[in-house]
């Protein structure tokens, strides 16, 4: 007996085997629809939204590092 999963896009049962070229999707079309949803941010992984603050956007340089940069 082979394992069957539902296509995440359309719900069609898909056999989970090396012969199923697009698993877990039933077709290349469903795979591309899913990829497009991730790309357009219609799908996302739940979690806190991260916005870099000005403190983390630039690395803090020591006085010694700044002096070395000024020498060049």
From Swiss-Prot:
Ranges where the record places region Disordered: 44-72
One MF term in the entry's GO annotations: zinc ion binding
Function: Inhibits all the catalytic activities of DNA gyrase by preventing its interaction with DNA. Acts by binding directly to the C-terminal domain of GyrB, which probably disrupts DNA binding by the gyrase.
Positions with a binding annotation for Zn(2+): 7, 10, 26, 30
GO BP, sorted A to Z: regulation of DNA-templated transcription
Gene for this chain: yacG
The family this protein is said to belong to: Belongs to the DNA gyrase inhibitor YacG family.
NCBIfam families according to UniProt: PRK00418.1
Cofactor section: Zn(2+)
Tagged with keyword Calcium: no
Record InterPro entries: DNA_gyrase_inhibitor_YacG (IPR005584), Znf_NHR/GATA (IPR013088)
Protein name in the entry: DNA gyrase inhibitor YacG
Complexes and interactors: Interacts with GyrB.
Stored Gene3D superfamilies: Erythroid Transcription Factor GATA-1, subunit A (3.30.50.10)
Keyword line: Metal-binding, Zinc
Keyword Oxidoreductase assigned: no
Native organism: Tolumonas auensis (strain DSM 9187 / NBRC 110442 / TA 4)
Cofactor mode of binding and number, as noted: Binds 1 zinc ion.
